[in-house]
Amino acid sequence: VTAQWIDIPTGNDTFGGYLALPKRGKGPAVIIIQEIFGVNSHIRAVADQYAADGFVALAPDVFWRTQPRVELTYEGADRDKGIELMKKTDVGLAVADIGTAADALRARPEVAGKVAAIGYCFGGQLAYRAAAAAKVDAAVAYYGGGIQNALDLAGKITQPILFHYAENDHGIPLDAVEQVKAAFAGRQNASFHLYPGAEHGFNCTDRASYNQRASALAHGRTLTFLAEHV
C-alpha cells in the first residue's frame, strides 16, 4: 500500500485527503468518511486496510473549513472538541466536499470502476446523505448517528446502501434503527445488520468499545457488498 496526503481542489480553495493506493495500482474506489475525531491514525489505518483489499481509498478532511487536519483521540477534551467541530460543520457543504472527493477519484488513472462511500459515526450519516445527493454509487453507514432524523432523504437513495448498527449503542437506540429500517421497507437496495452485544465504535481498534467479532463480520459483509456493487 502506498499512501500520502493529497490536495483536492474545490472552487478557489483546496482541502486535504489521505489517499491509499492498492499494490496493483488500480481498483474501484472507496471514500472513507471520518468520525468526529478527524482523519486520525485509525481512519488512515482503515483507508490502508481497504487499499490492501484492492481499493483506491480516499479519506477526505471533513472539518477542513473549521480546522484542517485535526487529529483527535476518543476521550475527554478531544471528544468535546470533536463534538464542537461536528456542530460547526455545515452538512450540506460536507456532502458537497464528498462529491468533490468522488469526482477527484473518478478523474484519477488508478480508479477503475465505481466510487462507494463508507462512513463511521458522523461519517455514516454523511455517507447516507452523499448517496441521497447522488454523489456516490453505493454507501455503507457504520453506526451512522442522526440518520433517523433525516429520513426525508431515504426516498432519494436508489443506490445500494448497507447499514451496520450496534445493539448496545447509547447514541442510536434500537427504535431509531427501526425507524431507518421502516423508511426502506420493501426496498431492494438497502441491507441492515445489527451486531449483538456490540457498542458504538465497535470497528475502531483504538476505542474501548472495539469488538473483534463485530468488526470482522461487518468488514466481511462490507467487502461482499462492495464486490457486488462497485
PLM regions and their residue ranges:
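N-terminal cap/leader regions of alpha/beta-hydrolase-fold enzymes
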Residues: V1-V230
